[in-house]
Amino acid sequence: MRSYRELFRTPEFTPFFLASAAQGGALTIGGLALATLVYRATDSPLLSAVSMFGPQLAQMLGATFLLSGADRLPPRAALSSISLAFAGCTLVLALPGLPVGAVFGVVFLQGLIASLGGGVTGGLLNEILPKDGFVLGRSVFNMVFGLVQVVGFATGGALLAVLSPRTCLLLSAALYATASVVLRLGLSARPPRSSGRPSVSATWRTNALLWSSRPRRLTYLGMWLPNGLIVGCESLYVSYDPGAAGVLFSAAALGMFVGDLSVGRFVPPALRPRLPVPLLLLLAAPYLLFALRPGLPWAALIVCVASVGFGATLAQQERLMALTPDELAGHALGLRGAGMLTMQGVGAALAGTVAQLTSPGSAMTAMAAASLTVTLTLAAAGRRQVRDAEPVTAARE
């Protein structure tokens, strides 16, 4: 499958796509509104960053206890219920006078719910599409999320100029509720991919199985660490330039769209395995220029160019699926998403802490340097793994 026409002719893909777009819009508008609300209340870059990316901090806890449900729950019911739960949480965040501590409690709950949703979504996409359509389909999902971010952050910034953050949160809740309805009406009822009831013990067993393979471990770490550190840079856009954060987020989303389009549509399958390291280096290196405190036009250009590097995730997910049994696809993708989002939350907290002690520009530079170091270290570990495997292969022959 190489064309978008074939992709959208696949039964159920279109409503799945539309619901994902609505959820992306809700996430971007609501996240920007919440970060703005917290920053106005606290004047803290750390709390602003964590409020926007804080749900990610709960992802790994959810992956530890809930992720077996990704393959053991009916996908349609699970996804529509998750979107409805997000609508409810966002309504709570919009309540006037909600204490900051309660805000972070709701944000933590959203992260737990999202840890299950990522696995169900990835597993269902793998089920709806044929094997040769997974990367193209995943790229479309990533691209629409990027486009929705461009529109969502631009719209969110414009809305915040004329409406209160709480009103924007209400709009976000309405989008989540709409997505829930689309999922319920647009998807077919399917049985779970794996037998048995979701449980903590089943989650732990499958996590241990997935983590037992060294190639999978390196693939997971490559998806989690460099990405998470750079999202720490993104979490500082509000404190770097409070009046133009929407422009920077939109520039990042545009770069992400270009990266996903290029990797998913134009790069030959034989070339994709070589892309992750160069793209991850591209993701981090431009942020070093924030040491110069660039103004808005240059900052937006830097962010856009760097975000092309997020296209590495498509090649990494394709490798993960090649290393994973089909019946564990949802769990494997859920663990990937939970770990990635957890590290994004850690990156946001770390970047916010450094910014609190120094400045947002200095913190971005430090996070970029850390991401480059991690990418080069993992690349060296991958080369050692290949060299170690070659004598074993030769001996068997």
Please provide the spans of the model-predicted regions.
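Transmembrane alpha-helix termini and helix-breaking/packing motifs in multi-pass membrane transporters
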Residues: 32-41, 92-96, 151-171, 239-243, ...
